[in-house]
Amino acid sequence: PTENATITYYLKDRHVFGDMKIEVYNAEGKLMATLPAGKRRGINRVTWAMRQKPPRVPPSPNLAGPALFGPMVPEGVYTVKLVKDKETFTGQVKVIADPKSPHSAMDRALQQKTLWKLYEMQERLAFIDESITDARDKARERAKKLDSKDALAIELEAFAGKLDELRKTIVATREGAITGEEKLRERIVELYGWISQYSGRPTESVLSRIPVLEKEMESANSQYQSIVASQLVALNARLAEKKLDQIKLLTKEEYDKKYKDK
């Protein structure tokens, strides 16, 4: 079966003025996709790739192949809106499982739930990683504004070094086409790939790995918080004394805003 849905509509006349687009909503009213609409007179067909946005993952020299693809949308009825300037025309698309699928609805639902769990873990790890690199880079920027032998510059570099070492435990950082380096990021992405390629019930061995990876991720976040809590207040006080910008930690709101339309 195809992974794309074809949305077909007829226009009596070619649309010339004003905006025109197609919006797809799930049963809860969440916008799932916005598609460019054909404007020519007669029958128009628009393809909806029934996948959601790929998960955001921490940057690394290692390509996160499986994370280049988002999950398939769940089975169900989706509302399609053709927005033509100030007019809106509504229809529906029904997404169903392959009738020949050997997997039960319960097994497919568990696969979707597990896949989304790993999707969210990749997104959370991406935020943790960027929080670490943001604080590290800010510390290094401040250190560069001081004499390299200045005590504060040395402490800032040490602070940045601790954060960098922590980051190396969660993300592969070695440069090269094939390094074989595998850290937390790579293990989560790999598991996401396995589950996304099989629409049936995940095996118990696969399911048992998820809480282990989640514990590693939260441990990394706790270490980051501990480093910050033990050093940042004192560093910021000394930065203020030298009339340098203090190090402000990246917030989730700032992070989400940065990637809102990406």
Predicted stretch roles:
Residues 77, 93, 124-262:
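Mature extracytoplasmic or organellar-lumen-exposed domains after removal of signal/transit peptides
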Residues 1-21, 25, 45, 108, ...:
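Contiguous beta-strand segments within globular domains
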Residues 70-74:
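Surface-exposed, short loops/turns at beta-strand junctions within beta-sandwich domains
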Residues 17-36, 82:
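Extended low-complexity, serine/threonine- and proline-enriched intrinsically disordered segments
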Residues 31-69:
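Glycine-centered tight-turn motifs at strand-turn-strand junctions
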Residues 85-128:
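Extended, polar beta-sheet/loop recognition surfaces of beta-rich domains
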Residues 9-11, 50, 95:
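Hydrophobic beta-strand positions in extracellular immunoglobulin-like domains
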